[in-house]
Structures are given as structure tokens and as C-alpha cells.
Amino acid sequence: MSDIIKDTKSRMQKSIDNLSRELANISAGRANSNLLNGVTVDYYGAPTPVQQLASINVPEARLLVISPYDKSSVADIEKAIIAANLGVNPTSDGEVIRISVPALTEERRKELVKEVKKIGEDAKVSIRNIRRDINDQLKKDEKNGDITEDDLRSQTDDVQKATDNSIKEIDQLVADKEKDIMSV
């Protein structure tokens, strides 16, 4: 397998991994520590992820418990969660922060499904852009005499197969997440 095809698959896999991370951050009405993935706290002047400042537990299906290692950071963590606009209200007793994840309404579920589809579509566009870039590079290589016309055709077919597989994987990830969101 040529380096170009390996590069193509590697770049496409990165797009799929990015999609997986984005989908993991979308709450399906159940408490999940991934909900706090993008939340950073201003801790002694440095933006720090919540995961580095506290242990995060999920004792019940709709409850997140955040136990800061440094009790003086409770208020800062709480402010950061509120500022992150996650659609949840943290409550604190001075030692731990509890986040009760509300049940999703039918309307909110539909909004989330739309968001998931949009994120999936963006990932597909990313995959297609990778395909276009690689195909342009292959045509340039053929024009410069670096590869033969047969190699061009063969590698273009390989790029298309990689694209098709990646799009199929994206569709599956999106369908699984939609099913997860719509299940009550």
C-alpha cells in the first residue's frame, strides 16, 4: 500500500476520531463524565480542565458528583460549569459539586438529533475534502511523471474505497448516537 493511501486513511481516521469525541460530548439525558470534557477552570491564573482538578463520579443515571482535590476551587469549578452552558445547574455544599442531569424533553431530543446530524455532515465534508486533496496530489504526481496513469487510476480507486468506508463509519456513529438520544 502506498504512502499516499496510508496518509489518506490516517487523515480520515483522525476526522472520525474527532467526530467520536464530539458525539461523546452530547448528553443523551444520562449523566456522563464526558459532559465536562470541554470545561476549563481558571485555576491560579491558568485554564485547567475540570478532570485535572477533581474526581468525577456517576453514582446514579442522572447524577454527576464532582469532588475537587482542592476544596478552595469548588466555587471556581461551579462557575466554569455554569459558564460552559451545558444546560445543567450545579449545586455545591462547599465540598462537592452535584450536577443533576435533567430528563430530555421530546423537543430537546429532536434538537440534539439535528445537532448530531450536522456534526456528522461536517465530518463527511471533512472526509470529502481529504479525498479531493489527495486526488489533486495524485493528478499532480501523474502530470509530473512521478506515477503512471495506471497507478493514478488504481490509487484513485483506493482513495475512493477509503472514503466510502469512512463515510459508512460516520453514518453508523451518527445512527447509533441518534438511537441513543431518542431512546427514553
Swiss-Prot record:
Molecular function, one GO term: ribosomal large subunit binding
Alphabetical list of Pfam families matching this protein: RRF
Region (Disordered): 141-165
GO BP, one annotated term: translational termination
Keywords assigned: Cytoplasm, Protein biosynthesis
Location in or out of the cell: Cytoplasm
Annotated Gene Ontology cellular component terms: cytoplasm
InterPro entries named in the record: Ribosome_recyc_fac (IPR002661), Ribosome_recyc_fac_dom (IPR023584), RRF_sf (IPR036191)
UniProt superkingdom: Bacteria
Major subcellular location class: cytoplasm
UniProt record similarity statement: Belongs to the RRF family.
Role of this protein: Responsible for the release of ribosomes from messenger RNA at the termination of protein biosynthesis. May increase the efficiency of translation by recycling ribosomes from one round of translation to another.
HAMAP family given in the database record: RRF
Record protein name field: Ribosome-recycling factor
